[in-house]
């Protein structure tokens, strides 16, 4: 199954309404057969025209919380038309993974020797209503600087559907294009640059009389848009990437969501802490206990840190040769059953548990051998079957069978999921064979020798691994070291026939992909991908060119990351088994922390953890935004995955046990405590309400709610202490 390079195109309808008329009536343009949507209230479609609400309305959002809209979670609208994708394949020998396409040709040139472009179009996949992730809520309430006015949608483009643009850099580009279009209207000039105003997509422009009120209105709106863009550009820190703007924004929004979640209940607070500690790259101060004299003496006797721990001497090659290798790479008495399961090798949701049962608990070796045969990678890279099986068995033996989740079963599942994602119609002919080899290999080794505890546990316990890797992606660095070290074992070098350049490039790609499985890097990965996709959406071409290493590895990193977080997108039967396993591993870590007298990590205390609520939060704040962004890249290929994800989320939501009402005396104590807790914040609010805050005299406070205990004064004597109403009004947190 060789892969070759491609240019992907989808043709869009050219039925575009008059831009000027639309700008007066709606302050944004609409194209083709799109549906009218109140975009700034949180509804969007999978693809289509990029929309921008009036600036005045965006500014007014600063005084309105997301809850004020009465919409708890944005949703999409059902659309009916499927996009048509035309793939033009090109010889992959013409493409250099690191250097990109041959010079001198545009990637869109039909005679170009190579490049891949994902063209986002104005035709849409049909799907049922589906909730949107928190990324599409307004971020206005989180911004304090007058230069940080945020918007939650984008402006018109004739090449896309009604997508909301949420990444800051793409919003700036979209706004500048709006300014340019308005300028052509105000001056009655027609642009001549094909790059910025393709003739095919240029909307008809009406002549405007400078004396008309509409002219003055449009001029003022244009000036305000330009001022907004300048304010945004002035705040950009030049030493940081533009995608970091999106990463910081998403982190602010997630922190806001987690604050609300933590205030709802004790279990909600635990889920909030787990998500924050695991998926946000927080540089927390860590108390590392000082080693005792006995510990120091013990460490002197330990092996040098330059040696890679966890590598065992195993012999699998003595009994292997090309004639003795079985059909699926493993010895089994259930070959027919195994063959039946592997019929789903190219499908999303293969039952890896059955594969493990029929392969004598060799799921990784079995799956990898099947994938390499399916893709003809053994022949392409001249890998002998016995060398491949020897390496895979050695690798699988370095996964710990006593670890409930991060074992060879999980590695096999991620490898198979990556294999399917690589075969997605939108990406099927995009990546080279070397990139495919690197992605599948990275998935196979990404958790090897996992001890069943988190990076933070290793850091907190002053482990050798944490010291070796300076607390940075400790386990991920270790997985890479072990995975590559095993290639040096006898009869294990599956890359021996690669050229020096191929080997160096593969190693570089594998390192990038495995390091991306560090969950603390999740928000940065998400922001990078979303910024890349949305930036291309607002350009005149609307083409996502994968013609350089940075863009290509960015897609591959997110692909492996998606595969690593794919459990909630599988069938409920499989998802529940994975959930049971990860919770068992969490609880085992919690027991170790309890034995050591350490603070138990969130979701690791088997006595207090809420499994159902943790899965709902995991989907809402981590999995859904990631897969939603991936679906934007490869649409409509991921629609079924999103549907399954929503079904699973709803099932776990329905299984959350209803908490009983607390005793009345506890309510009284809570109310009294709340009055004492929020008295200071109420005083600040009253002071703020007396007038505008003076420059340089701002207050810093943390309360996100005002809580009042109300007692009817006329019936105070006749009421017991339990007759108390608690009125709560949500307020936005203020960070300084």
UniProtKB/Swiss-Prot annotation:
Changing residue 575 to Q: Changes substrate selectivity from cAMP-specific to dual cAMP and cGMP binding and hydrolysis. It holds the Pfam family PDE4_UCR. Hydrolyzes the second messenger cAMP, which is a key regulator of many important physiological processes. May be involved in mediating central nervous system effects of therapeutic agents ranging from antidepressants to antiasthmatic and anti-inflammatory agents. The modification Phosphoserine is found at residues 290, 659, 661. This is 3',5'-cyclic-AMP phosphodiesterase 4B. Zn(2+) 2 binds at residue 447. Residues 51-78, 189-209, 282-301, 685-736 are annotated as: Disordered. The keyword Zinc applies. Mn(2+) binds at residue 447. It comes from Homo sapiens (Human). The gene is PDE4B. The keyword Metal-binding applies. AMP binds at residues 406, 410, 447, 564, 615, 618. Keywords: cAMP, Cell membrane, Cytoplasm, Hydrolase, Membrane, Metal-binding, Phosphoprotein, Zinc. Its EC number is 3.1.4.53.
């Amino acid at each position: 199954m060789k892969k070759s390079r491609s240019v992907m195109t989808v043709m869009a309808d050219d039925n575009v309404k008059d831009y000027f008329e639309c700008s007066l009536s709606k302050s944004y343009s609409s194209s083709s057969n799109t549906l009218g949507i109140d975009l700034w209230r949180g509804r969007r479609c999978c693809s289509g025209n990029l929309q921008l609400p009036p600036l005045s309305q965006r500014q007014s959002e600063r005084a309105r919380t997301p809850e004020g809209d009465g919409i708890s979670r944005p949703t999409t609208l059902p659309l009916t038309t499927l996009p048509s994708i035309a793939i033009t394949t090109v010889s992959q020998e013409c493409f250099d993974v690191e250097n990109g396409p041959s010079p001198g040709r545009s990637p869109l040139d039909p005679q170009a020797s190579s490049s891949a472009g994902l063209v986002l179009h104005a035709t849409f996949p049909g799907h049922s209503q589906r909730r949107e992730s928190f990324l599409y809520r307004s971020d206005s309430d989180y911004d304090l600087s007058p230069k940080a006015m945020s918007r939650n949608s984008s402006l018109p483009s004739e090449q896309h559907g009604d997508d909301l643009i949420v990444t800051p850099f793409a919003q700036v580009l979209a706004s500048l294009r709006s300014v340019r279009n308005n300028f052509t209207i105000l001056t009655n000039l027609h642009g001549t640059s094909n790059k910025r105003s393709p003739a095919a997509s240029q909307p008809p422009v009406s002549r405007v009389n400078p004396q008309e009120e509409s002219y003055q209105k449009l001029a003022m709106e244009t000036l305000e848009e330009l001022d907004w863009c300048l304010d945004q550009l002035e705040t950009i820190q030049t030493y940081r990437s533009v995608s970091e703007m999106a990463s910081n924004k998403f982190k602010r929004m997630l922190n806001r969501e987690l604050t609300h979640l933590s205030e709802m209940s004790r279990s909600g607070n635990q889920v909030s802490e787990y998500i924050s500690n695991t998926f946000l790259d927080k540089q927390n101060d860590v108390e590392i206990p000082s080693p005792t004299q006995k510990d120091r003496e013990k460490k002197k006797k330990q092996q040098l840190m330059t040696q890679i721990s966890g590598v065992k001497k195993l012999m699998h090659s003595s009994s292997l040769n090309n004639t003795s290798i079985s059909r699926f790479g493993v010895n089994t008495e259930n070959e027919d059953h195994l063959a039946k399961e592997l019929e789903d090798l190219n499908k999303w949701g293969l039952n890896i548990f059955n594969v493990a049962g029929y392969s004598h608990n060799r799921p990784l070796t079995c799956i990898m051998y099947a994938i390499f045969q399916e893709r003809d990678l053994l022949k392409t890279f001249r890998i002998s079957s016995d060398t491949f099986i020897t390496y895979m068995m050695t690798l699988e033996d370095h996964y710990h069978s006593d670890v409930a989740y991060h074992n060879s079963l999980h590695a096999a599942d991620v490898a198979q999921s990556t294999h399917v994602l690589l075969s997605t119609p939108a990406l099927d002919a995009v990546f080279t064979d070397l990139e495919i080899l690197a992605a599948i290999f990275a998935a196979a080794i990404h958790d090897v020798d996992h001890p069943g505890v988190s990076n933070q546990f290793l850091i907190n316990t002053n482990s050798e691994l944490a010291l070796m890797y300076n607390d940075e992606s400790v386990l991920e660095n270790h997985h890479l070291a072990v995975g590559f070290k095993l290639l040096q074992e006898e009869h294990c070098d599956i890359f021996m026939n690669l050229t020096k350049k191929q080997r160096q490039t593969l190693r570089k790609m594998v390192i990038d992909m495995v390091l991306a499985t560090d969950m603390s890097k999740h928000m940065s990965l998400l922001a990078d991908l979303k910024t890349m996709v949305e930036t291309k959406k607002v350009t005149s071409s609307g083409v996502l060119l994968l013609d350089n290493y940075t863009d290509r590895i960015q897609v591959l990193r997110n692909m492996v990351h998606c595969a690593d977080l794919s459990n909630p997108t599988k069938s409920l039967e499989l998802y529940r088994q994975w959930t049971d396993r990860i919770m068992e591993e969490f609880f085992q870590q919690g027991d170790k922390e309890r034995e050591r007298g350490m603070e138990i990590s969130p979701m690791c205390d088997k006595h207090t953890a809420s499994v159902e609520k943790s899965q709902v939060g995991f989907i809402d704040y981590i999995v859904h935004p990631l897969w939603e962004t991936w679906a934007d890249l490869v649409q409509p290929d991921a629609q079924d995955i999103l549907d399954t994800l929503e079904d699973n989320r709803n099932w776990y939501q329905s299984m959350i046990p209803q908490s009983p009402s607390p005793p009345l005396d506890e309510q009284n104590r809570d109310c009294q405590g709340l009055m004492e807790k929020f008295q200071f914040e109420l005083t600040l609010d009253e002071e703020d309400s007396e007038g505008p805050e003076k420059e340089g005299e701002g207050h810093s406070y943390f309360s996100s709610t005002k809580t009042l205990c109300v007692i009817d004064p006329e019936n105070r004597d006749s009421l017991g202490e339990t007759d108390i109403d608690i009125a709560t009004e949500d307020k936005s947190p203020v960070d300084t």
